[in-house]
């Protein structure tokens, strides 16, 4: 019983600590923030487009149907496994937090 309350209390204090740290951030100038954000967004989108185009070219150059089929099979199996284990972990966390024995 004590460890459950300790875990819940620890998580609450952790969240409150992060909220308190975020509260002391000084306010930025409203006029300069959107321009900087826009520049960063355009730059990141440019990098993303370049990387996506390079990956697409590499994929087209090295495309093999058997490898593609194996990759799709591995992807479907791994996502099924991750979904299963995520469900198990979610159930365990819910069980710990709700206090069911």
Curated annotation (Swiss-Prot):
Annotated InterPro entries: Apo-CII (IPR008019), ApoC-II_dom_sf (IPR023121)
Subcellular location: Secreted
Region (Lipoprotein lipase cofactor): 78-101
Keywords from the UniProt entry: Chylomicron, Glycoprotein, HDL, LDL, Lipid degradation, Lipid metabolism, Lipid transport, Secreted, Sialic acid, Signal, Transport, VLDL
Keyword Signal: yes
Keyword Ribosomal protein (UniProt): no
Description of post-translational modifications: Proapolipoprotein C-II is synthesized as a sialic acid containing glycoprotein which is subsequently desialylated prior to its proteolytic processing.
Main location: secreted
Span of the signal peptide: 1-22
Gene3D superfamilies the UniProt entry points to: Apolipoprotein C-II (1.10.1440.10)
Molecular function, one GO term: phospholipase activator activity
Region (Lipid binding): 66-74
Pfam family, any one: Apo-CII
One GO term (biological process): lipid transport
Gene Ontology cellular component annotations, sorted alphabetically: chylomicron; high-density lipoprotein particle; low-density lipoprotein particle; very-low-density lipoprotein particle
Function: Component of chylomicrons, very low-density lipoproteins (VLDL), low-density lipoproteins (LDL), and high-density lipoproteins (HDL) in plasma. Plays an important role in lipoprotein metabolism as an activator of lipoprotein lipase. Both proapolipoprotein C-II and apolipoprotein C-II can activate lipoprotein lipase.
Similarity comment: family membership: Belongs to the apolipoprotein C2 family.
Protein name: Apolipoprotein C-II
Species in which this protein is naturally found: Capra hircus aegagrus
């Amino acid at each position: 019983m004590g460890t459950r309350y300790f875990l819940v209390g620890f998580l609450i204090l952790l969240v409150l600590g992060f909220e308190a740290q975020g509260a002391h951030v000084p306010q930025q100038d409203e006029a300069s923030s959107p321009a900087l954000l826009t520049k960063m967004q355009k730059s990141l989108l440019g990098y993303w487009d370049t990387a996506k185009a390079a990956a697409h070219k590499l994929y087209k150059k090295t495309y093999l149907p058997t490898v593609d089929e194996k990759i799709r099979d591995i992807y479907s199996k791994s996502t099924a496994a991750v979904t299963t284990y995520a469900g198990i972990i979610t159930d365990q966390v819910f069980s710990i937090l709700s206090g069911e024995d």
